[in-house]
């Protein structure tokens, strides 16, 4: 059994989350229970609890007992002309009765991997007027630098992301959303002791009077 504890600090607000994952030795299914601090803030409750059943690379089922939200995800991949093609179908809905319940949402995601350095991805939400097309290019022999331009046809806008990995588990990522003029910088570190750390800052370039938004996260993994 594996346990994960995550802490997140955003301005003057701190949140925490914990996950327990159990994989039967005779099966490739994985059972997972995740809870945020909302599950314990006012005594034990179902709020903030998510139950997951998944078979990696095949399907995933998420259930939030408090809101009765359900998410189904099915994925598959195959070789087509020596190119890896991957497809993911995601359907989100709620079992809660009432006229105010949010509408169901269905999304399709596909990717075509040309080689280890080049991949084309496409995502579309059924009922929407557009899609997102992303190209990923990993530069160099070790592919430590990744460049990812993305075009949103619905908003007619570009997003750009550049990630640089370093020896030792460090990585720096910069993203820019042209539609919102939002610039984000992330630094992450993966530790050999089963922990990871992340510090992020985002800047609203459309209103330079706003202070940057700072976020710090830490994740710890344990074997039980």
Swiss-Prot record:
Q: What is known about its subunit structure?
A: Homooligomers form large rather nonselective pores in plastidial outer membranes.
Please state the gene responsible for encoding this protein: OEP24
Q: Which family is annotated?
A: Belongs to the plastid outer envelope porin OEP24 (TC 1.B.28.1) family.
- Chloroplast intermembrane compartment ranges equal 12-16, 43-55, 81-101, 127-130, 167-169, 190-212
State what this protein does: High-conductance voltage-dependent solute channel with a slight selectivity for cations transporting triosephosphates, dicarboxylic acids, ATP, inorganic phosphate (Pi), sugars, and positively or negatively charged amino acids.
Q: Which UniProt keywords apply?
A: Chloroplast, Ion transport, Membrane, Plastid, Plastid outer membrane, Porin, Transmembrane, Transmembrane beta strand, Transport
Query: What is the recorded membrane topology of this protein?
Result: Multi-pass membrane protein
Q: Name one GO biological process term.
A: regulation of monoatomic ion transmembrane transport
Q: Which residues lie on this side of the membrane: Cytoplasmic?
A: 1, 29-32, 65-70, 112-116, 141-154, 179-180, 223-224
GO terms for cellular component? chloroplast outer membrane; etioplast membrane; pore complex
* Source species taxonomy: Eukaryota, Viridiplantae, Streptophyta, Embryophyta, Tracheophyta
Q: Name one GO molecular function term.
A: porin activity
The residues that cross the membrane are: 2-11, 17-28, 33-42, 56-64, 71-80, 102-111, 117-126, 131-140, 155-166, 170-178, 181-189, 213-222
What is the protein named?
Outer envelope pore protein 24, chloroplastic
Query: Where does it reside?
Result: Plastid, Etioplast membrane; Plastid, Chloroplast outer membrane
